[in-house]
Amino acid sequence: MPNSPVTVLSENPISVAPEFFGMHANRRAFDRLPGIMLKTVRGHDLQNGKGRWRFIETSDNTWTFTDLDAWVNTHYDAGRDLLFTLYGTPTWASARPTEIGAYGPGNPGTQAEPADMTKWDRFCAKIASRYRGKIKYYEVWNEPNMYNDGTAPIPGTTFFFSGTFAKLAEIVRRANIAIKAVDPTAKIVSPAVTNWAAKAGQSAENYFTGMMAAPTGDGSTTMKDWVDIVGVHLYLSSGNSTADLAGMIDRVNAAKAAAGVSSMETWDTESAPIAPNASALSDDQLDRYLTRFMVTAAAKGIARTMYYQWDNDVMGFRERINIGGRWNALRELLLSGSILSASKLFDGRLIYRTSTGTTIV
């Protein structure tokens, strides 16, 4: 009903798989994330960024795997699904080796595509060969639309990708070919577009459809032909407005339909409160954020969501025992399928019904 104070999120029971709950670790590649239950981990920014290509292949065909080995083995041994982000061009391989982006002057050229794309092929194949059977999922690049409209980045900004739609599409195609030649069961997650909004025609939606339709350089395919899963980042607007989340997911689904990839799962590979961040929230406030976010995401069909980050000083909650306990309780609630329906009020509060009554958060 127009102007209704209540928006139905789901009229059916809400249930998720164990893989729905995911996490990042920032500082310790060997951190098993004790105290919280989860099934999916993402490797972006592991050990303060040591999972980026530039720190793994430090010069042409010279490799350092210490931190990545620790991360992979720790979480594989814990029985978790691993999502590894292929990203971060070394200066020596960069198409624009003096370019400065999100990681500052100490990491020149990182945001550019490789000058010689066969170096990218070799990197992807090397990772897939070393971790075959352990890493199942590969995400290609990180937030390519940050200060980039698909033609070029805005100079002087903290962009993560400085290439074009076509270059990004080629990167995805070549990663798919290199990885699946080694491990045909591996899955490719699309570059995760960020800055979604709950309105039509916004920049994230336009970027997503543009990149999915971009030619890959082989004369016949576009990016959508080379991805298996859609990745997005569902950071909320100022005030961590969970009231906007359902509308954001609706726009993701509209963009997927326009791109011809509606049948693919959607993974929120990175999200957290940022305006303000977790360190500025009380336990009660962070608890409300997590409950509203997770239940809404589950109700709207997000297959996995990965909190950023467990042990970050401003975004994490490693030392907050109450939040860890609430995370685990929320996980059990969603795994049980006991939420029979869910709605949201205009002010962002969540209402969900179980067999024992109604809860407002």
Segment roles from a protein language model:
Residues 19-25, 38-48, 81-86, 136-140, ...:
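Structural recognition of the beta-strand scaffold that forms the well-ordered cores
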Residues 29-35, 216-218, 296-297:
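Mature extracellular/periplasmic domains of secretome proteins
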Residues 79, 131, 135, 183, ...:
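A structural signal for short coil/turn segments at secondary-structure junctions
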Residues 2-132, 137-140, 144-161:
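N-terminal substrate-binding region of glycoside hydrolase catalytic domains
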Residues 28, 48, 89-91, 145, ...:
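Short, solvent-exposed loop/turn segments at secondary-structure junctions
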Residues 76, 180, 298:
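Anion (oxyanion) recognition and catalysis
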Residues 98-227, 233-254, 276-293, 316-318:
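Active-site cleft segment of glycoside hydrolase catalytic domains centered on the general acid/base Glu
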Residues 4-9, 291-361:
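Aromatic- and carboxylate-lined catalytic core of secreted/periplasmic carbohydrate-active enzymes
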